[in-house]
Structure formats: C-alpha cells, structure tokens
C-alpha cells in the first residue's frame, strides 16, 4: 500500500512541478522541463517497483509529464517548438550518458566512496540506453504528430485535454512497447517483461 500512496503523491508532485516551471518561466520553462525530465526519467527507469499489483519501472510519471509539456508547447507555440523540445530532450540525455560514462572511467581516489554507486546507476547496459533513446525519439515525434492531427478536428481551447490525452495515450503505448522490447526482451522472464509493459 505504501508504493501506491507514494506513487499517487509522486504523480501530483511531478505534475505540480511541471506547472510551476511553466508558470514561472513560460515556454522556456516547459522546454527546460523536457530536458530535465528526460534525464530524470532515464535514471528512474533503472528501478523496478511493485505497484498496483504489477511490476513497473519508475520513470513513467515523469515521461507522462514530458508528453504533456510537449503537447502544451505544440498547442500554444506550434509543432516546430514542440519538435525542438523533443530534440533538446534527446540531446540532454545523450550528453548525460556521454559525460557520466566518461566520469566512470576516472580512477577514483583511495578515499572515494562514490564510484561503486555511480557505476551501479550510470554504467548503463547499452540495450537500456539504446532502447530509451529510440523509444523517446519515436514516441515523442508520434505524440507531436498525433496531437497536431487531433487538433485539426478538436481545435477549441476546451478540447485541449482530448488532444493531450489522445496523443499521449497512443504515443506512450508505442514508447513503452519499443523501450521494453529493446531493453528487456531476452534479459528477464516474459511475464516480467509483460508486466513492465
């Protein structure tokens, strides 16, 4: 029950922080949220938890907030700005992976206590990193595209949530399916992979 309560709290806090970034910094706040959120979600996805009767990786809530941020950018500032935010999220993840991999190759000082912990978190299995990057790019571009298509049908301000939820649900399913397939198939039992999906 703890994970469920904490999961709901995490959901509320994550989306409240995204709204706060938007309120304080406008368009730039949402673009920054995409970059920050992508890095956070790619670190969170390493941890598996049991929640609501299933095994899931963390990062799903953060990724959902990223989808909403790109939907808001797409709705208010246009598809071009949303796509730039997607590429910024990809670039920030790539920079994080490269810099942290380089950091791991330094020989630690005899008094260092961080190397093993950093190695455990950032010595990403190539499949996970590749799966994450491929799923992110494809999922986000599909989200931006679907949102734009739905907006042609439901264009009023009152129908934003139809556009946002419609595009996010479809693109999240594709994103998760791609990520789980690339990162985990063949590395864990099929039932565990199915639960994560």
Predicted regions and their residues:
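Transmembrane alpha-helix boundary signature
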Residues: 43-53, 76, 98-111
């Amino acid at each position: 029950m703890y994970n469920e309560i904490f999961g709901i709290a995490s959901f509320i806090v994550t989306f409240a922080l995204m709204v706060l970034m938007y309120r304080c910094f406008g368009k730039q706040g949402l673009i920054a949220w995409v970059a920050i959120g992508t890095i956070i979600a790619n670190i969170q996805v390493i941890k598996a938890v049991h929640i609501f009767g299933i095994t899931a990786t963390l990062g799903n809530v953060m990724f959902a907030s990223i989808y909403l941020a790109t939907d808001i950018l797409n709705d208010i500032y246009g598809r071009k700005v949303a796509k730039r935010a997607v590429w910024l999220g990809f670039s920030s993840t790539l920079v994080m992976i490269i810099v942290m991999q380089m950091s791991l190759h330094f020989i630690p000082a005899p008094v260092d206590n961080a190397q093993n912990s950093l190695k455990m978190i950032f010595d990403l299995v190539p499949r996970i990193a590749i799966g994450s990057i491929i799923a992110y790019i494809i999922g986000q571009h599909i989200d931006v595209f679907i949102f734009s298509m739905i907006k042609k049908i439901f264009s009023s301000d009152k129908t934003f949530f139809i556009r946002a939820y419609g595009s996010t649900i479809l693109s999240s399913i594709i994103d998760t399916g791609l990520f789980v397939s690339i990162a985990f198939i063949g590395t864990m039992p099929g039932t565990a992979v199915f639960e994560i999906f």
